[in-house]
Amino acid sequence: MRYIVGLLSLMLTCVALSTLAVAATSIEGSWIGSGTVSRGANVDRVQCRVRYTKSSENSCATSSVCTTENGRYEVSGHVTNIGGNRYQGTVTSGNETGRVIMVHRGNQQSVTVTSPSGSAKITLSRR
């Protein structure tokens, strides 16, 4: 469960840093939000703080801290703009790696992370 939370955090961090190709709106900086992490039949609430740092014209590195009632997780990763307001990439927490899909709209991001262990869905807002 913690790996999924970490992966989600990482994804969110990467997306916030990237610049939208079409709208040229920067998502770089700090974001905060919440959502759910699912692993099998277990579903937990998660809260995340994400920081995006631009690494190239269309990509960013992310660093995140996410918490659930079961613990605190640090997540890192990378995301790339794949067109318009959509981003994809990977995040890592501990030994777990996940795939990130993010949609950016104004001051909000919808992030989905999937891994062999489960998935996470988080909504982030600019801090």
Regions found by a protein language model. Name each.
Residues 6-18:
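Bacterial N-terminal signal peptides
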Residues 21-22:
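Signal peptide processing junction and immediate N-terminal pro/mature segment
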